[in-house]
Amino acid sequence: MEQLLHYVWKHKIFPLKELKTTTGQQVEVIDTGLANTNAGPDFFNAKLKLDGVLWVGNIEIHEKSSDWYKHGHDTDPGYHSVILHIASQIDTEIKGSNGERIPQMQLSCPESVYANYKELLETDSYPPCYRIIPSVSSFTLHSWMSALQIERFEQKAALLSERLKRCQGNWEDAFFITLARNFGFGLNGDAFEAWAHRIPLRAVDKHRNDLFQIEAIFFGQAGILEDFDGDDYYLRLKKEYAYLQHKFELVPMDASQWRFLRLRPTNFPHVRIAQLACLYHRAYGLLSRLMETETLQEVRDILKGGTSAYWLTHYTFGGSSPSRPKTLSKSSLDLLIINTVVTFLYAYGLHKGSEVLCARAGSFLEELKAENNYITRMWEQCGMKAGNAADSQALIQLKKEYCDKKKCLYCRIGYEYLKRK
């Protein structure tokens, strides 16, 4: 209920006239203030008139006024600047840390808002607001989508920042781990990330001119060179890895982490590892090259990949198959660009203070085709069709950060739903 009161106050969903404090002072709301999601009062820099006198300060909201004491605000100097305490139930007077009484106002949630909110939380339909989406103005939807796009950029940049810290600020290492994870295309994402942490790029750099040696490191660290028997290529890789393992003190991962169930052969870990080995053999300074690209085609040309000759006729070690190039499909390339390259362009742009790189990240998304997955298909059924990858990223953000977490109070579509009569 307290969150709902925050919502009612923020959006002024209450009678603006005849508002009074518990002691009878007339209240005129000029500005409800800026919502605070961190520690401290709920709204900063609100502007009110109490009996015609202008007050500027903070607002605190509780379900019961006694919660003020329950939460220890009476002894916290951080709440000294509260000019009005709002509660749906007034059960006691309150005082600040300086001992002065703080004005209070009783505020109830309108019945229609409460009923709509309860409906959103309890409905079995998904998303619960689907009925009203067709009636929401295009301006509201477009502005909300734009905000979600930026929010997703910022969220991904924050996650990348944490990864960078774990990589001691090394952008190349962070990029390799991110790229490898996304090469898992969902099912093997965790396994590829664990594998990438075991790949010493400095060792790879020393053998970059020899694709066979890079493959030996990559496959060996994946834990899939442990069998005693195999074809000639497998046995040569195994022997080469034994030498490199001793040279660089390498410790392989447990091969049981890899998943094969329900995977198409082109998505088998062996094929993806072979593609990554070829990519790092061909593209020296991969991250720098990608950050310098100006067109999507340049990015695709760098990432399009390929494999050594052995993998033209194999999906795993052993049994052969008809010869077929193992290059990344356009849809797979685009997913790697969306989830890896664009993210790094934006984050690196922030790091360098480069508006050009940040803008390029946005323009790449707008140029890329919208993702086709269960989330985008669900929104399309509700009347929200993604026109490009920027839109599909926004819709993914909407589902994961608002719908799944029931944060309807913070969603602009939820706002339209709640204000219905």
Q: Model-predicted segments: where are they?
A:
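Cysteine-cluster motifs in flexible loop/terminal segments that predominantly coordinate metals
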Residues: 393-421
